[in-house]
């Protein structure tokens, strides 16, 4: 065999090995991309479940209309989610909760199971659980306002939540907690209506969720080869 032929064979083998590695990396990245899309969808489902729970005790026409729209969006997203990687059983439980919007604890159990499913695939559990604490504060304050004030049991739940969230360094969260404590939690008669409670804290919840989504997208891009990164 001539030197030229040997060099040609060696180059062909090296090229084949390189192309195989590129194909493997490309496939792995496609799989990772699909899983990130599924996680992002789960975070949207989490947001909608928390909203549906927070709207569940409200009877105002605008709140009922928004709750119906949230329920329709949830049903559609869960149908789409079933075709994505890492499916879960949220859709089956949601079918029952859709008809019982005031079932606060039922929503909370479903949300906890969704957060656990997310945490199994990506280390987002702590951020999602803190987000859920804030969303639960919103929902319980709506409930307290709707029923004309806190029962001792409800006040104890809210006080425990506020204490747990009190360690959060977010100044805006502390301000909102103070307003809810004065206006609902420790007030003999609520000074904030259910829609006001819901509207007060929803922007903070949405902002925190966006932060989790952006972190997930950023982390997924860090593993990309330069040629695969957008821009």
Task: Go through each PLM region and give its residues.
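Hydrophobic alpha-helical segments
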Residues: 2-231
